[in-house]
Amino acid sequence: MIVLSLEQVLQIHALIIKTTGGSAGLRDLGRLESAIASQTQNVFGEELYPSVIDKSAAIIRGIIDDHPFVDGNERTAMLAGLTLVKLNGHHFVAQTCEIEDFAVEIATGHLDVPAISSWLHRHLTP
């Protein structure tokens, strides 16, 4: 299974800022590393998030909750999570406004990984 690296997430963030605007920059490297590590987190020797959808949800939540970037955290989180889904062979379909609204819902409602994973599953197509 493919997971995202620190370098890939930094590239995604740079792309987001370049194409949609905002202030570039990393606010806290440790928080970003923590968000990225969440996709491969183990508890008692077992993967906490075994499926690619759960890993995607974990990285989305981690970036949104930890705010490691100066700007563009929600946009970067969603693109990183959806990139992870695509890299692992899944097809995600949603309108841009749905994705934006859901990112805000995660940020304001502090949705957990299972809730984010459920939303992602509803938008997968064969």
Locate predicted features:
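FIC/Doc superfamily catalytic core
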Residues: M1-P126
